[in-house]
């Protein structure tokens, strides 16, 4: 299966954090569809493996917070997870929305934007990374994704998928993120707000590394980060932050 060609988007960019999560249930197909419709440059989502080897799009290690069921994702089969309602806790109008698999996301949206994939657990012998690579090749999106994670994920990426883009989160809660990004040969790093300043951004850019920020929902805050050189901002408030990025892209006042 081959995705349509995706033209590179200019920087600065807006990354829809778990989709358009301010308006829709996070990490669901409606949330991603809304982000596509609004014109997000990238979607960020999280992956956990199920007990029977499916790559499930969900942030937490358990179903408890975002669905009407309980249980640890890694200890449950996909059929059990698919039976959980991932919409109703966000609002009655979302009843019936389910947590998708990675394949479901790419069936719907491959070729429409880039994907920032936060791998929470690389799996035994890098299973998650190896399957992610296999699916990316199947859906023709290898050049439309990058994988974010801490040290165990970065090490598995270097071992099992060195050709795929990496985004370093290791050192995010400190001042050594850029050094870790260089160590893991990453094309991107993702700063946390409190440890992001112009000097760190310049250091990353000097090393040829693209800089993400996690996160900004306030338009004025987003504008300040764009002004000091951040390349991409993760946000839950897509409708509010997207116009700020477009002003920065085209030099509008």
Would you name each region that the model predicts?
Residues 1-253:
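Phosphate-group recognition and catalysis centered on beta-loop-alpha active-site segments
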């Amino acid at each position: 299966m081959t995705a349509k060609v995706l033209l590179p988007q200019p920087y600065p960019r807006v990354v829809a954090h778990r989709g358009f999560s301010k308006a829709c249930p996070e990490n669901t197909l409606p949330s991603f569809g809304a982000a596509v419709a609004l014109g997000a440059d990238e979607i960020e989502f999280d992956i956990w493996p199920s007990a029977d080897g499916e790559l499930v799009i969900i942030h937490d290690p358990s179903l408890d917070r975002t669905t009407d069921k309980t249980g640890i994702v890694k200890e449950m089969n996909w059929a059990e997870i698919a039976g959980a309602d991932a919409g109703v806790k966000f609002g009655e109008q979302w009843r019936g929305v389910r947590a998708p698999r990675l394949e479901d996301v790419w069936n719907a949206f491959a070729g429409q934007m880039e994907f920032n994939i936060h791998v929470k657990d690389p799996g035994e012998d890098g299973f998650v990374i190896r399957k992610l690579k296999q699916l990316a090749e199947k859906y023709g999106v290898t050049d439309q994704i990058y994988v974010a994670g801490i040290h165990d994920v970065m090490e598995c990426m270097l071992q099992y998928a060195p050709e795929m883009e990496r985004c370093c989160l290791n050192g995010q809660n400190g001042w050594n993120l850029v050094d870790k990004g260089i160590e893991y040969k990453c094309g991107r790093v993702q700063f946390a707000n409190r440890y992001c300043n112009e000097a760190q951004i310049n250091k990353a850019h000097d090393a040829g590394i693209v800089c993400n920020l996690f996160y900004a929902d306030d338009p004025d805050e987003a504008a300040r980060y764009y002004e000091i050189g951040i390349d991409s901002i993760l946000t839950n408030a897509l409708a509010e932050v997207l116009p700020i990025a477009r002003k920065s892209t085209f030099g509008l006042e």
